[in-house]
Amino acid sequence: MGRHNENIGHQARKRFGQNFLHDQGVIDRIVRSINPKSDQNLVEIGPGLGALTEELLKSGGSVTAVELDRDLTPILRTKFFNYPQFNVIEADALKFDFTQLATPERPMRLIGNLPYNISTPLIFHLLTFRGLVQDMYFMLQKEVVDRLAAKPGEDAYGRLGVMAQYYCKVESLFNVGPGAFQPAPKVWSAIVRLTPYTEPPLACKDVATLTTVVRQAFAMRRKTLRNTLKQLITVDALQSLDIDPQIRPERLGLPEFVRIADYVYDHPLENES
Ligand SMILES: C[S@@+](CC[C@H](N)C(=O)[O-])C[C@H]1O[C@@H](n2cnc3c(N)ncnc32)[C@H](O)[C@@H]1O
């Protein structure tokens, strides 16, 4: 414990969501899960002071790190100057165009102990590059991992889980307590693995329509489908799809959402805005 982040004099910045990992056991466990190989294209988001980066570099793979805090990039360059396969880019990962870091032939393995305040929009941003991604390993607030991996009927089930599971196989790997970080966050964290499908197993006709249906359905999660989806689909149409209009959205699985989205795409209601 405490091996990293010492003697560097960097004050953790709350606005950048800086909670630095300092538990070597947790770092090793994450890297063992990733199992990086020397010919791989590893991309780390938010390397911080390089606790994970160092172990990734030891695998021999190339590591490109995307870090927003301009005070950290020189520290990282100095720390890893012995590793020619290390590169740090000073950029906001939320706006960064990841197409410059990978090709379909050399996809990225995305890794990050992500800033918790931006993790949901960042995951949606990263999903847009899924064709260039082999897999993703993220440390997130446990509550967000629960939402990503949630199944129908669970409290955590909602838009994030449905859309992530549409594009990716989602696996919650293990939990990490606050004491593994400096400063310690207030909440528990967890590691999630997202593996994008080459082709979604339940492909819908139009993802924009699926997104609209899912967003609308969960906008009022305590209401029944006949209410939440009334601007998109009629009760008769829901019944024709073998979906009970009286149930709440949290009971619908991905196949039902895809069925509704395909119907809505083929039969747009006139009052749809
Ligand atoms: C939770 S810390 C993790 C640091 C390090 N990976 C570790 O495990 O100790 C999050 C890191 O993401 C960086 N960060 C915050 N917002 C960012 C953004 N929009 N784009 C890229 N990096 C960001 C922070 O400066 C910080 O280094």
Swiss-Prot record:
Disulfide bonds: none annotated. CDD domains: AdoMet_MTases (cd02440). S-adenosyl-L-methionine binds at N19, L21, G46, E67, D92, N113. It catalyses: adenosine(1518)/adenosine(1519) in 16S rRNA + 4 S-adenosyl-L-methionine = N(6)-dimethyladenosine(1518)/N(6)-dimethyladenosine(1519) in 16S rRNA + 4 S-adenosyl-L-homocysteine + 4 H(+). GO terms for cellular component: cytosol. Its EC number is 2.1.1.182. It comes from the Bacteria. One of its GO terms (molecular function) is RNA binding. It is found in: Cytoplasm. Keywords: Cytoplasm, Methyltransferase, RNA-binding, rRNA processing, S-adenosyl-L-methionine, Transferase. InterPro entries: KsgA/Erm, rRNA_Ade_diMease-like_C, rRNA_Ade_Mease_Trfase_CS, rRNA_Ade_methylase_Trfase_N, rRNA_adenine_dimethylase, SAM-dependent_MTases_sf. HAMAP family: 16SrRNA_methyltr_A. PANTHER family: DIMETHYLADENOSINE TRANSFERASE (PTHR11727), DIMETHYLADENOSINE TRANSFERASE-RELATED (PTHR11727:SF7). Specifically dimethylates two adjacent adenosines (A1518 and A1519) in the loop of a conserved hairpin near the 3'-end of 16S rRNA in the 30S particle. May play a critical role in biogenesis of 30S subunits. Belongs to the class I-like SAM-binding methyltransferase superfamily. rRNA adenine N(6)-methyltransferase family. RsmA subfamily. This is Ribosomal RNA small subunit methyltransferase A. It comes from Hahella chejuensis (strain KCTC 2396).
